[in-house]
């Protein structure tokens, strides 16, 4: 009898220890998930507020709004009394209900420096990550997620086109044809390396003409004066 009581006591202690372990693991997992969701919420906010207006379309604005809705809903499941998240979710749902008539108030932010181009690349990387996570959550259908991943790559190309063009044009204004030639040459090489260069045939032709113009100016400046 005593042996049975001892065995039962040991089993009870093991069960209690296991339950405590499960409870602690659940708490840790919940805390980890909250940290991750708050980070995703912050990134969505950065995308909404700081993405350059010349690259933001109503469709993209709607996508970012939907991505933030997904994160808010998941966060609210963990913090049901979070009034700030509830209020933000109501605001986002009202915006999403407008479809592609959603207002786009992002001001244009010309890409004129390496630092600015790098900042926007980071935003695009964040957007790529948010799309991937939303697909993993089951919020975005796989086909839609793939389509938006392609669109992110397209926007990245547009970013480089604008950057190399602005860099070259600025150099021309400063009467630095050598620097302009280098910028336009970088743009031409970048477009030629794209998997589907024909998509950017018009932009490539434009940059090639600017490159030829800058090259002619460099050659003219190196001609000996008679």
Annotate the PLM regions.
Residues 78-82, 95-107, 138-140, 206-226:
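Alpha-helical linker/edge segments of TPR/alpha-solenoid repeat scaffolds
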Residues 71-75, 131, 138, 191-194, ...:
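Alpha-helical junction/boundary sensor with strong preference for TPR arrays
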Residues 28-31, 35, 144-163:
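TPR-adjacent "capping" and linker segments in tetratricopeptide-repeat scaffold/adaptor proteins
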Residues 1-37:
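N-terminal signal-anchor transmembrane alpha helix of single-pass membrane proteins
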Residues 36, 40, 64, 153-156, ...:
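Residues that mark the junctions of alpha-helical repeat units in TPR/alpha-solenoid scaffolds
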Residues 43-134:
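Membrane-proximal, non-transmembrane interface segments of integral membrane proteins
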Residues 161-226:
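Long, non-transmembrane cytosolic or organellar matrix-exposed soluble domains/tails
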Residues 13-14, 129-153:
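Repeat-mediated protein-protein interaction surfaces in helical alpha-solenoids
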